[in-house]
Amino acid sequence: KSYFLGGAGERGLTIEGNFIKFTAIGVYLEDIAVASLAAKWKGKSSEELLETLDFYRDIISGPFEKLIRGSKIRELSGPEYSRKVMENCVAHLKSVGTYGDAEAEAMQKFAEAFKPVNFPPGASVFYRQSPDGILGLSFSPDTSIPEKEAALIENKAVSSAVLETMIGEHAVSPDLKRCLAARLPALLNEGAFKIGN
C-alpha cells in the first residue's frame, strides 16, 4: 500500500502555565483516500473544512487505511503514554454509547502492548487502522516503520476512537486538525481532477 501525509501536529500539556510538547503526530492516508474524500469535499476551502466535524469523521471512518505516527519529543514510558490515550478513548466511547465488554477487553490488550515499552526522545508508536476495524500497533526506536507489529486489536470502535481523540470533536491536537484542513483541499482538487480524466 502507498500512503501520503495528510497532516501533522503536536500534542502536549499545559503545566504551570507553559505548554510542554510531548508528541509529534503524523497522519498518513492510503492513496485511495483522495478519491474517497474528494467525492464530498472537493472544492471546499481550508476554513470550511476546519469548521466541519463531518470532514474529520469521514477521514476517521473512510474505507481506506490510516497510519498514525506518534514520535516522542520527551521521554515517556509506554504505560504513561498509553494511560492518557486510553483515558481519552474510553471517555469518547462512553460518550457515544459504544463502550461495552468487547471494548474494555480491547483496551486491556492495548495497555498490555505498551507495558514493556519505553519511549526515549525520537522513538515512535505506529497505529495502523484498517477499514475492517483492525488496529495494528508497532514501536520503533526512531521514525522508521517496524517490519513486525507488536499487537493487533480487532475492535472497530476502539480503532476509530484512537484517531477520533486526535482530530475529532475534542481533539488533543488542534494543530493536526488545522494541518489536515490546510493540506487536503489542494490534494482533493488535484486528485479528483486526475481521477476524473
Swiss-Prot record:
Enzyme Commission number(s) from the entry: 5.5.1.6
Pathway(s) it belongs to: Secondary metabolite biosynthesis; flavonoid biosynthesis
Source species, domain of life: Eukaryota
Keyword presence, Metal-binding: no
UniProt key word Cytoplasm: no
Key words, A-Z: Flavonoid biosynthesis, Isomerase
Record Pfam families: Chalcone (PF02431)
Reactions the enzyme catalyzes: a chalcone = a flavanone
Marked site: Important for catalytic activity: Y81
Example GO molecular function: chalcone isomerase activity
Binding residues annotated for substrate, in chain numbering: T23, N88, T165
GO BP, sorted A to Z: flavonoid biosynthetic process
Enzyme class: isomerase
Family per record: Belongs to the chalcone isomerase family.
Role description: Catalyzes the intramolecular cyclization of bicyclic chalcones into tricyclic (S)-flavanones. Responsible for the isomerization of 4,2',4',6'-tetrahydroxychalcone (also termed chalcone) into naringenin.
Additional free-text comment from the UniProt record: Part of the biosynthetic pathway for all classes of flavonoids, a large class of secondary plant metabolites, many of which are brightly colored.
PANTHER family: CHALCONE--FLAVANONE ISOMERASE 1A, CHALCONE--FLAVONONE ISOMERASE 1-RELATED
Name of the featured protein: Chalcone--flavanone isomerase 2
Organism: Medicago sativa (Alfalfa)
Organism classification: Eukaryota, Viridiplantae, Streptophyta, Embryophyta, Tracheophyta
Gene name, Swiss-Prot/TrEMBL: CHI2
